[in-house]
Amino acid sequence: MESSGPSSCHSAARRPLHSAQAVDVASASSFRAFEILHLHLDLRAEFGPPGPGPGSRGLNGKATLELRCLLPEGASELRLDSHSCLEVMAATLLRGQPGDQQQLTEPVPFHTQPFSHYGQALCVVFPKPCCAAERFRLELTYRVGEGPGVCWLAPEQTAGKKKPFVYTQGQAVLNRAFFPCFDTPAVKCTYSALVEVPDGFTAVMSASTWERRGPNKFFFQMSQPIPSYLIALAIGDLASAEVGPRSRVWAEPCLIEAAKEEYNGVIEEFLATGEKLFGPYVWGRYDLLFMPPSFPFGGMENPCLTFVTPCLLAGDRSLADVIIHEISHSWFGNLVTNANWGEFWLNEGFTMYAQRRISTILFGAAYTCLEAATGRALLRQHMDVSGEENPLNKLRVKIEPGVDPDDTYNETPYEKGYCFVSYLAHLVGDQEQFDKFLKAYVDEFKFQSILAEDFLEFYLEYFPELKKKGVDSIPGFEFNRWLNTPGWPPYLPDLSPGDSLMKPAEELAELWAASEPDMQAIEAVAISTWKTYQLVYFLDKILQKSPLPPGNVKKLGETYPKISNAQNAELRLRWGQIILKNDHQEEFWKVKDFLQSQGKQKYTLPLYHAMMGGSEMARTLAKETFSATASQLHSNVVNYVQQILAPKGS
């Protein structure tokens, strides 16, 4: 289908956005009354014992916010997002231009106000109201110790077991527990930071510039505007190695060789393919930081420096799609951002689509369809557990005041979002035209935060012939239905190119489900050549058919040590689920072993669900495993596991 091309819908002035009026019930801040222009952090990290009291671990220093008043009538107070774990000691207002003789510096009163269980408001009162369009700086002296935004790890929670480690995790609303801010994805600013660390430690941040300033100080600058949730810091015993012209890996010294081996030369190929499809990579560097094993996520797309789980060091480059996913966020999420967390699908649905476009070009359609089929299976699993009509199974989630956006996290924005973007590509009917559209979309909305309306209006402007046809209101596929009706996606992309890989896996699973497995037929299937996702797909089918007839799981494990003794986390997760679903108690230790080796939420929670849904022995295993590993898990993951072990109202 011929496109009108970007020229006809591109005006020199930026279009007015629906998102300019969007509310964010998860922020206590006055982000519509002030524009944040720049943030500077000046922090000193201290590793001591946990808890309050002198000498305890914490970050001490200052946050300086450069702001401009947007209200025509001026303003007499400013509200920032903060948290009870932040102790603000002083607030100073700097009026006039920096370096100006007339610059006024005055201490200003401040107080906190309750907001929700995940944050509070920090209210700064101006002695003299600021005028419309006035620029000023606010300097806050503060300290943060224990809290949800800054994660302190004892040496035993790291890979090297020798030195402590600290990192921050901002998404979704945790950076208010790192520094006072407008903690909403609706607004963006540049930032800089000066971080002082103890001897023998290195600091890294999500910034385009990294400089050593003396033995223990590091300076960072992010020259592109980003939302607060993407500002990230990590401090530990870190080494680095170059793996491409604009990429290096960072990791603890004991992991650096494995990290280099796994990713040397491959990242540039992913980046270059992304640029061909979606336009220039604007962030300068793309580095990877391999986190300690307790890191709860697969990856966090902090710009310039993606934080990733060490589970990706599979030794065979088989989990590189996670890196492709995080790289895809460089365009979708980091450059064009959801304006509030109810629109999370704009970040994740597009990123899944982009990841699978890159993967199709590099690894072929069969492999990508197979990977997408495992994603679809996860969505099916989620909807079976939560109920299709659950309001969280809409693309646009209504987040109620007081609800932590993190608690709405599930597969829907990823996989149903992917289906919606695929449906829009299907309406266009020409992959090349849709790729061009995505490039134009990124260019149109770069460095901005948007709502679904902004995107869909642009789509219909770009393809006027589709607008004329009324594709937004085709019965059963209405855009409004996609966004606001819970349940299974109305359209599923065709994954049949993956049949050549899926069919053999389905047939093999069928053989293992027989009460008397035909070992001759089973041994005729050479799984030694299968890629990881083919094995994952096979295990998903085995799990669906479980419990298998008695003795079959034991035999399956003996037949395929490649699966039952795998080091690959995706295989270990599914083997653990199969062990539990079949109550194969002699291998229960493998579940505990896996949960002790890492703390990724995506692997941890399903195994606790499986243990608590299993036999008495399995439930005992859950409690024993949790008491052995709780101290090494992220606080959010601890809370979720506790809810599985003792559901509210039980």
UniProtKB/Swiss-Prot annotation:
It is found in: Secreted. The modification N6-acetyllysine is found at K446. The keyword S-adenosyl-L-methionine does not apply. The modification Phosphoserine is found at S7. The record marks Y414 as: Transition state stabilizer. Zn(2+) binds at H325, H329, E348. SMART domains: Leuk-A4-hydro_C. Substrate binds at G298, G299, M300, E301, N302. Widely expressed. InterPro entries: Aminopeptidase_N-like_N, Aminopeptidase_N-like_N_sf, ARM-type_fold, LTA4H_cat, M1_LTA-4_hydro/amino_C_sf, M1_LTA4H, Peptidase_M1, Peptidase_M1_C. PROSITE patterns: ZINC_PROTEASE. Its cofactor is Zn(2+). Keywords: Acetylation, Aminopeptidase, Hydrolase, Metal-binding, Metalloprotease, Phosphoprotein, Protease, Secreted, Zinc. One of its GO terms (molecular function) is peptide binding. Binds 1 zinc ion per subunit. It catalyses: Release of N-terminal Arg and Lys from oligopeptides when P1' is not Pro. Also acts on arylamides of Arg and Lys. Its EC number is 3.4.11.6. Belongs to the peptidase M1 family. Monomer. Exopeptidase which selectively removes arginine and/or lysine residues from the N-terminus of several peptide substrates including Arg(0)-Leu-enkephalin, Arg(0)-Met-enkephalin and Arg(-1)-Lys(0)-somatostatin-14. Can hydrolyze leukotriene A4 (LTA-4) into leukotriene B4 (LTB-4). This is Aminopeptidase B. It comes from Rattus norvegicus. The lineage of its organism: Eukaryota, Metazoa, Chordata, Craniata, Vertebrata.
